Each structure stands twice: as C-alpha cells, then as structure tokens.
Amino acid sequence: MPVWEIVLRYALLLAVLALMIGPFLWQLSTSLKGPHENIFSSPPSFLPSSPTFHNYERVADTIPVWDYAFNSLKVAAANVVTNCVGATLAGYALARLRYRGRRAATIVFVLAMLVPVEGIIIAQFTTMRELGLNNTLIGVLLPACVSAFNVLLMRNAFLNLPYEIEEAAFVDGANVWQRFLRIALPAVKGTLAVVAIFAFMGAWDDFLWPLIVLSDPDRFTLTIGLNYLHGTFANDERLVAAGTVIAVLPLIVLFACLQRYFFRGVGEGAVKG
C-alpha cells in the first residue's frame, strides 16, 4: 500500500475521532471551569486554568440528580433484562424453529424497525393510559422492553452457528430447550453483550417518551431531570456541561467493561447477504 494512502487513511480516522470525541471533551473541559473563566473566549481555551468540581456539586444542589439517576438505572436495568431474554428467545425461534409464517414474522420485525417512534407515540400513550401505567416507570419501560433490532441481531447470530451441532444434539435426544440453553446460547454471548449495551443505552438516553408519560417529579429519569438545569431566561453552560458528563459516565463504564464482547458480538450478529 502506498504511503500516501496510509497517511490519508489515518488522517480520515483522526478527523472522525475528533468529530466524535471532540464535543464530549469540550463538555468535560467546560464542566471543570470555574465561574471566573470565560468559556466563550476567542481563541477558545480548551484546558481549564483552575480545574474545579464545584459545578458537579451545584448539579446535586439544583436537582436531585442521584434520585433521577436511580430511576434511570432501574428502567435501564429492566430494559436490559427484558431485551436479552425476549430478543434471545424470539431470535432463536426465527432462526432455528420450523413453523408456518416464520418468514412473515421476520418481515414484520423488519417493518417494525422502519416505523419512526414519533409516528406511534400517541398510540403508545393511549395504550399506557388504558392500562393505568401512565406516570409509572413500568410505563416508561414497556414500549421498548423488546426491540425489533435486537431480535434481528440475535436471529442473525443464531443463523451463523453451524446447524450440524444442533442436529447431532437432536439425534442424541436433546430437546429444543436443551439445544438452546446448552449449545446455541453460550455461542452467542458476544451478541448478547451487544444487545445489553444497546438496551441500556436506549433506556438511559431516552428523553421524549419519559417526558410524555411521566408527570410526577419523583419518578423523573435523569434525562428529564437534567432539562431543569436550563434556566428560563439564562443558562449556566458550566452547570449543563457537568450534568451531561454525569449522564454519560455510566455509559462509558458499561462499554469499557463489555467492549471485548461488543466487538466480537458485532461480527456474530452481522447481517448476512
């Protein structure tokens, strides 16, 4: 490979990295700046002259951030469990079980991915109201408890497994649950980690649906609570930046713990042509 192609490739990678990581680093820098530092100076100053954690203390004084974070954690953890269980069972059924309408069911899941959430959000709200789940964390969880994308991801992971292994287990007398739990499921742990990460991120970052379904401040999730850091007539960008960093840190920790499974799982669940 010519040298100029290598240089161009790494230059593009660095440019993409700057676009992806730059805004977060800027928010982190802003959150560490004191009230006497001008965050809108020209040229901009990236490194704070006197780093301080006072902005994080102010976030906790302004809103009950830890209560909101705990509500988000409950919803996100439940979303991980329901997606891992539901998507795994549905994905295995679509990939391995033989029944009439299996292809049609797969098409339904694909079509479900194409429907924008905003287009069905009124129907979701009406359904939650009829079930008496408005203003509850269960009402926040239920619409996204099993994602069509995660189902298809698990389906493709199971399709990539050699079917001969399960056939041999079937000949030895293993039933479908034994083949699923002892052969198929251990082989797709990487994809399961990907599903867990996507489910946690989706629930943790969700703003629109909790904003619509929740009205009691004691049940607010973190994304809604952080919205109250914006003033009506004036904003303290340092305070908002500190709240943003608090919201992002759990996602960074989760990905750091599961990254080796994530990259392996992306390959397991890749869409086959």
Task: Cite the ranges covered by each PLM segment.
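A structural signal for multi-pass alpha-helical bundles of membrane permease subunits
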Residues: 5-273
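Short, Lys/Arg-rich, polar N-terminal cytosolic tail immediately upstream
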Residues: 1-3
